[in-house]
Amino acid sequence: MDVSVEIPSCALGEDPENMYATLQEAGWLVVTGLATPAELDAVKSELDPYLAAAEVEADDSEAFYPGHTRRVIALMHRSPTLRQLMTHPTVEQLGDRHLLQNCKKWQLNVSAALQIGPGARDQILHREEDLYDYWAPPRPNLILASMWAISQFTAANGGTQIVPGSHRWAADRVAQPHEIVRAEMPPGAVLFWLGGTLHGGGANLTRDEWRYGVILTYTLGWLRTEENQHLSIPFAEALALPEKTRTRLGFHTDYNGQGLGFYDPSVLLPD
């Protein structure tokens, strides 16, 4: 790790143009203070039963996902608090600036709670936009990713690996060890990174700390999402959600108002 690299960071309330300029340049940004202690406690309370039931994954050195990790997906049904944080004003500001360049509406791509335990190895470096391999890197703006720190993130306990500037690299450039930075941040902070930025979960070198984070990524409204939100949340529950939340969950289509059968899914929602 190149310890000389300063983590680009700011606090809640920073001018959104300044935030996005930093994010565009560095490929990543930490914003502190986005979730309150009460919201963090609520997320823990809502997800604890699911994480307690999740099997701690065994490790396979060649597998994409490291072992010694608990993973829970489909969070929008399981955590009402995360549904609110999913449309946090800072998320909306950065999402609009990054994604509306290539769409009219953008949507949640995937949600997952991750607890990285002692003994976990570094994850393979990858790009969120590798999901859409029709384009070769560097790609157009396709994804904005975020990692919410539910616990403290440190270089030792599994802080996310980031390769600054890699969103501008060609596909065949390989990150060297000195180019990798580990994101450190307090609970309630959010790490944002661009879909083209190389990153991966960090190794947990501690004896007894579990690094707890929630990943929410967003993509263009006309792309197929990695996680099908229409199947992840009961329809009756979706009916009662605010319009902006329904839009982020893909209930309002992006392209010419046309969805499956030329109907926007919103025709099923209340006026």
Model-derived segments and their meaning:
Residues 1-25, 32-126, 130-135:
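Non-heme Fe(II)-dependent double-stranded beta-helix
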Residues 68, 78, 109-110, 142-144, ...:
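Residues that flank catalytic or metal-binding motifs in active/ligand-binding sites
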